Design a protein with these regions (language model features):
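Small-residue (G/A/S/T)-rich helix-start motifs and N-terminal tracts that mark the onset
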Residues: 1-121, 128, 132, 221, ...
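Short acidic low-complexity segments
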Residues: 144-157, 353-357
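Internal gly/pro-rich beta-alpha loop/helix module
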Residues: 158-160, 165-261
Length: 560
């Protein structure tokens, strides 16, 4: 965020003071909205998450100075807003917002009840800093800041606490006075019933990866500026953000070009359903995509049903399943719409011959769900990577196919294949870590960077499944962070459904990155819908996703 501020100031000519004023106006408006004083907040994108008198309209006008004895107007007790300001720009934003509340009192205000303002700081600000300048202006309105203390905050009994302690630049664990301030704000929220509004991101939450840096403020709402940050959506920090509101302050995408990773592609900014392919009214089963699903093994027939069924439900015109002979009867009974071919799971030669026969039929293939890591499965994956460039238009690799690539060092074949046709990998975190040959914990620290480097090296697209799935591609600067979904999707077979969906979207002509992003988004929506119909996320099964997929892609295509 600091880099974006500098770029906006240096390259676009927007003074830093103007950006701060606009940010403070956004904070001020959210204060009014939360306290219900009647001032409508300006247009904003949103997701779900010294004491001086600022009087609203209808109040006695113009009073500033010490208001500790003021009990408000005839409409009731005055609201109390405590601003806890750190020494950096985040604290200056908070102090500036407090000053705007005081200006409203002088001008007659816009609310219906007074807002009593008290500003707490952590240390005397240094000369020449934005915070020092904002506090100096506050003094002109009769407002004097005071050092933060738990006793003073408790005694003030605020209705609202504005957390302006730390912004997006925090990267170390909280300690000392800062930790005490965070604990104090949480205490007043929990025991005193105060609402908490965080400025940019709750203090103690890493804006880059959502980590909790020791401890964090538990906000009811977060107002951020210009663009969302990854920490607003990544666990565990996203749970501390409450409702997240994004307000424009003049930092444009042009100002962000110096820092490409800020182009995090979120549904709230550009819904992926907008890029779903149009259905040709004169099309036929052949023109809507022919998908070969290579899945299943002995006693693992469900993966075939989930993946192939999802491909059909997401719009594929024809689907054929290639699996072991033991699964034939189950497939014919549960998914009669699918074409079917089988091979001997104990014979690598049988598997290779069946694959070669069927690759010529399909335009696109999905390999991996429930495939196992047998010699026959290894032969299929190896042969598939060799033959796909000349036989297919696109390939999706999931589950055991990814494990086989990692365990048998098939990276060179993967890259050669991906240089010829679009290849999408859909691993979960553990499979992805195995593919990258790192520990899962290391991957979780910075998934976007790890995934981006691998995608560039191997010329592919990766959809890494997690509570917040991430999509990257070698040819796409954006990183898509999916925010749809529910823990109802934490069930066996859910990933097979997703893989089938992504393959179907690819087969209908979508770019690999777009197919992966839209697939992840729709899959999450399907989980939410299934959980809503069942009434309990615990009871949702993968087959329920197939039921709710009916109409879902078309419903969102119509909204684009």
């Amino acid at each position: 965020m600091a880099q974006a501020d500098r770029t906006a100031s240096e390259k676009l000519g927007i003074p830093a003071a103007v950006l701060m004023e606009r940010a403070a106006m956004a904070v001020r408006d959210e204060v009014y909205a939360i306290l219900g004083t009647g001032r409508p907040a300006a247009a904003a994108d949103s997701l779900t998450a010294g004491e001086t008198c600022a009087a609203g309209a209808g109040a006695e006008s113009g009073r500033t100075g010490d208001c500790r004895e003021n009990t408000g107007t005839g409409s009731g007790r005055a609201f109390r807003a405590a601003f806890v300001c750190g020494k950096g720009n985040n604290g200056a934003d908070g102090a500036c917002a407090a000053r705007l509340l005081l200006e409203d009192s002088t001008a007659g205000g816009c609310g219906h009840r007074q807002v009593l303002v008290r500003v707490f700081t952590m240390a005397p600000p240094k000369e020449g800093t934005p915070l020092r300048a904002q506090l100096h202006t506050l003094h002109a309105y009769g407002c004097r800041e005071e050092p933060f203390s738990q006793e003073a905050l408790d005694a003030f009994a605020p209705d609202l606490i504005v957390d302006a302690l730390f912004g997006t630049g925090l990267s170390r664990d909280l300690e000392g006075d800062a930790l005490s301030a965070v604990q104090g704000m949480n205490r007043v929220r929990e025991q005193g019933g105060a609402a908490v509004l965080a400025v940019d991101i709750p203090s103690g939450v890493s804006s880059s990866d959502g980590r909790i840096l020791g401890e964090c403020v538990r906000a009811d709402e977060t107002v951020t500026f210009a663009f969302y940050k990854r920490g607003h959506f990544l666990y565990p920090g996203c749970r501390a953000c409450g409702k997240v509101v994004c307000r424009p302050i003049g930092i444009t995408k042009k100002a962000l070009q110096a820092k490409p990773e800020m182009f995090t592609y979120l549904p709230q900014e550009d819904p992926p359903e907008r890029i779903l392919p149009e259905r040709d009214p004169a099309g036929n089963k052949g023109t809507n995509g022919k998908v070969l699903v290579i899945a299943g093994s002995l006693n693992v027939a469900g993966a075939c049903v989930m993946a192939a069924g999802a491909a059909y439900r997401t719009g594929a015109g024809m689907v054929k399943v290639l699996t072991v002979r033991e699964n034939r009867e189950i497939l014919q009974e549960t998914l009669p719409e699918a074409l079917l071919d089988t091979y001997s799971g104990s014979s690598a030669q049988s598997a290779r011959e069946a694959l070669q026969k069927n690759l010529g039929w399909a335009g696109y293939a999905l390999a991996g769900p429930g495939l196992s890591k047998s010699e026959a499965a290894k032969e299929i994956v190896t042969e598939l990577l060799l033959e796909a460039p000349s036989k297919l238009k696109g390939l999706v690799l999931d589950a055991d196919a990814i494990r086989l690539i990692a365990e048998n060092d098939l990276y060179a074949l993967l890259r050669a294949c991906a240089e010829s046709i679009p290849v999408i990998l859909t691993p979960h975190m553990a499979e992805c870590a195995a593919l990258l040959r790192i520990e899962t914990g290391e991957l979780k620290e910075d998934p976007a960077t790890w995934l981006k480097n691998f995608a560039k090296l191997h010329h592919c697209t990766i959809l890494c499944k997690d509570a917040r799935s991430t999509v990257v591609s070698y040819d796409e600067r954006k990183v898509y962070l999916n925010t749809s979904g529910t823990n109802a999707l934490s069930k066996a077979g859910s990933g097979d459904v997703l893989a089938g969906m992504v393959t179907a979207l690819l087969a209908q002509g979508m770019r690999a990155f777009d197919a992966a992003a839209a697939g992840a988004y729709l899959h999450g929506l399907a989980g939410v819908k299934a959980a809503g119909l069942s009434g309990d996320a615990r009871s949702v099964m993968a087959r329920d996703l197939l039921r709710v997929l009916e109409g879902l892609p078309e419903e969102f295509a119509a909204r684009s």
